């Protein structure tokens, strides 16, 4: 005697019917092998990926920082793996790397090179002299105190000079910035004033270093704590310091 469950058979039939509906010819089943061969992306991401993988820099070296960048051309660091191809013409470059001191005479040339580069274009400021003027930032009449006064900077790379590893890190940060850009918002984020057109107005002032030290009143009059510690009156100490200064 064989006993069959009617409910179980009906459940099986419903499962088979559901499979036939879901996995028919018009709707093929997506397997794991097929999903591994598909890449889903957008046109914006594809465009950014192509640009960040082929940055063509224009090397603008005016000082000793450029020697550190020249180390990247060798096989030890091999910056070609990032798609960097140095160009000699600004019309073929989309990245300019300023390395070294920027003087007043070189400022118009730098701005002209930047204007000749096609859009979109990026700037990496390499070294302390490029970012703030470095050791030439004080008492210098011929040095630009920061290249961002001339052209917009995307990545600042401090150091005196920065190591080749730091340059690679700056390039990686720039690649991340390029990957996050949007084609629709690029026109809205475009800078209207790319550099300062106002000329430097240098005014004459009294010299800071006159060669005479201890001219301040605090330096000329000894503190009372000194007289109390030595037991000598303040007036006597003041006269002694005055005689030594005359001698």
Curated annotation (Swiss-Prot):
**E.C. number, please?**
7.1.1.-
Q: What is its main location?
A: plastid
Cofactor dependency: [4Fe-4S] cluster
Amino-acid positions noted as binding [4Fe-4S] cluster in the UniProt annotation, renumbered to this chain: 64-65, 129, 160
Subcellular location, in the record's words? Answer: Plastid, Chloroplast thylakoid membrane
Q: Which GO terms describe its molecular function?
A: 4 iron, 4 sulfur cluster binding; iron ion binding; NADH dehydrogenase (ubiquinone) activity; quinone binding
Cite the cofactor comment.
Binds 1 [4Fe-4S] cluster.
Q: Does the keyword Nucleotide-binding apply?
A: no
Give GO terms for biological process. aerobic respiration; electron transport coupled proton transport; photosynthesis, light reaction
Show the SUPFAM superfamilies listed in the entry.
Answer: HydA/Nqo6-like (SSF56770)
Cross-referenced Gene3D superfamilies, in alphabetical order? 3.40.50.12280
Q: Which reaction does it catalyse?
A: a plastoquinone + NADH + (n+1) H(+)(in) = a plastoquinol + NAD(+) + n H(+)(out); a plastoquinone + NADPH + (n+1) H(+)(in) = a plastoquinol + NADP(+) + n H(+)(out)
Identify the keywords attached in UniProt to this record, alphabetized. 4Fe-4S, Chloroplast, Iron, Iron-sulfur, Membrane, Metal-binding, NAD, NADP, Plastid, Plastoquinone, Quinone, Thylakoid, Translocase, Transport
Q: Which InterPro entries match?
A: NADH_UbQ_OxRdtase-like_20kDa, NADH_UQ_OxRdtase_20Kd_su
Q: Name one GO cellular component term.
A: respiratory chain complex I
**Which Pfam families does this chain map to?**
Oxidored_q6
Q: Does the keyword Thylakoid apply?
A: yes
Which purpose does this protein serve, as stated in its record? Answer: NDH shuttles electrons from NAD(P)H:plastoquinone, via FMN and iron-sulfur (Fe-S) centers, to quinones in the photosynthetic chain and possibly in a chloroplast respiratory chain. The immediate electron acceptor for the enzyme in this species is believed to be plastoquinone. Couples the redox reaction to proton translocation, and thus conserves the redox energy in a proton gradient.
Stored PANTHER family: NADH DEHYDROGENASE, NADH DEHYDROGENASE [UBIQUINONE] IRON-SULFUR PROTEIN 7, MITOCHONDRIAL
Similarity comment text for this entry? Belongs to the complex I 20 kDa subunit family.
- In Swiss-Prot or TrEMBL terms, this protein is called NAD(P)H-quinone oxidoreductase subunit K, chloroplastic
Q: Which organism is it from?
A: Mesostigma viride (Green alga)
Q: What is the lineage of its organism?
A: Eukaryota, Viridiplantae, Streptophyta, Mesostigmatophyceae, Mesostigmatales
The encoding gene is ndhK
């Amino acid at each position: 005697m064989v006993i069959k469950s009617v409910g179980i058979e009906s459940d099986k039939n419903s499962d088979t019917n559901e499979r036939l509906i879901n996995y028919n010819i018009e709707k093929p089943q997506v397997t794991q092998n097929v999903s591994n061969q598909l890449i889903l992306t957008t046109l914006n991401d594809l465009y950014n990926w192509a640009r960040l993988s082929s940055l063509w820099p224009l090397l603008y070296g005016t000082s000793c920082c450029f020697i550190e960048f020249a180390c990247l051309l060798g096989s030890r660091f091999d910056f070609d793996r990032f798609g960097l191809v140095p160009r000699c013409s600004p019309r073929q470059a989309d990245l300019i790397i300023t390395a070294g001191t920027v003087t007043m005479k070189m400022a118009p040339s730098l701005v002209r090179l930047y204007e000749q580069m096609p859009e979109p274009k990026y700037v990496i400021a390499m070294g302390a002299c490029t970012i703030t003027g470095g050791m030439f930032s004080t008492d210098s009449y011929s040095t630009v105190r920061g290249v961002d006064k001339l052209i917009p900077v995307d990545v600042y790379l401090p150091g005196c000079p920065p190591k080749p590893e730091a340059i690679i890190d700056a390039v990686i940060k720039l690649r991340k910035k390029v990957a996050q850009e949007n084609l629709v918002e690029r026109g809205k984020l475009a800078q209207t004033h790319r550099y300062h057109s106002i000329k430097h107005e240098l005014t004459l002032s009294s010299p800071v270093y006159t060669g005479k030290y201890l001219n301040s009143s605090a330096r000329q009059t000894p503190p009372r704590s000194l007289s109390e510690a030595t037991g000598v009156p303040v007036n006597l100490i003041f006269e002694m310091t005055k005689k030594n200064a005359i001698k």
